[in-house]
Amino acid sequence: MTQHVCLPSDISPEQFLSEYWQKKPLLIKKGLPQLVGMFEPDDIIGLAQDEDATARLISENNQQWSLKTSPLTAKDFQKLPKHWTVLVQNMEQWSPALGNLWHAFDFIPQWQRDDIMVSYAPSGGSVGKHYDNYDVFLAQGYGKRHWQLGKYCDQTTQFEAGQPIRLMNEMGELIFDEVLEPGDVLYVPTNLSHYGVAVEDCLTFSFGFRRPTPLQLLDSLADVATHFDDLAIPLKINQPAAVAGELSIASIQDIKAQMIALLNSELSDEIITQAISETVSKRQYELMLPDAYADIDEIQSALAAGAVIRQDMSSRIIFTQTETDSQTQAKIYVNGCAIDADDIPANAQSLLIRLANGESVDEQILQAADVETDIICDWIENGWVVIDYPEEIIG
């Protein structure tokens, strides 16, 4: 099935990635028309009060801001000031139809996906002037929001003191100043200051993309390295003349040189690949698994009726490929864990890779792949895939 791409008709994915990605903003008029009418404000206010939701309630009164985080209750929404916003994270967990809209951004590998956040605000509501350490596509799903973009920021950017959220006093010269209507999408690069104010009751959906930090990778490297016995052997250090209490610079440089040599070794390539893959495939939020077991007969009947299997977009499924003896070997990672090749037949691994690449699998494809339905049941119960029934398929 051909997927809609969230880009202007005159800009290709290759052009966007070379000219706009992490460089400059882009307005995409009617970039996600499928989003219009998918949710109403009351849907989000109700969801924010669910005990399993990750939500924030931000309000402003006389330039003093307040923040309340989950759990939220109906009482929290009583006697609010005029300007307030409620935000709910991880929306793909709650709506597979919304999660499928990630495919509109398949020109960016899914290992960079963060989550879909929604913000509801009545007229005048906002979360203030700020910047984010990630790239985001701001999609208008309901009502209108006025967006302003300003200067690029960094770690030296100053925030207002005495506020519970990161707020900037000013954004410098504005480079964008427009109102987004339902279906419109605004791409905002990482570290670009932005300020969105509801023109009327509105819902804005944020499709965030994030890269790992060096600290996350170092932590993962240390964890992965503990499983390699070769790294438990002490280093051999050339011993220069030194007084009893001194750790000499020469010894430090010797250890450093050996560590650099290790980082450039084939063993390190394996460790680093696994550490990076596990880090970027981890979910930020706890996965909500299905309440009921998947039924083989029901799945087979659904597929026969025209249903398809798709990746559950609240899970992260990625794969790496390496060349070994002139053969390409794939390694699959799901939600931060490497999948042992012995646990899944080769044909099922190939099917899982196709699902990770955004394909929908129907009955004919499943039969041709010769993958048993009980394997699909396991994937459903683990939250890896979902069944899209005919009436729920998004065109």
Briefly describe each language-model feature range.
Residues 1-5, 167-179, 195-395:
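Fe(II)/2-oxoglutarate
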Residues 18-22, 75-83, 318-329, 377:
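Short, surface-exposed loop and linker segments with low hydrophobicity and enrichment for Pro/Ser/Thr
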Residues 1-20, 32-184, 192, 197-241, ...:
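Active-site region of the double-stranded beta-helix
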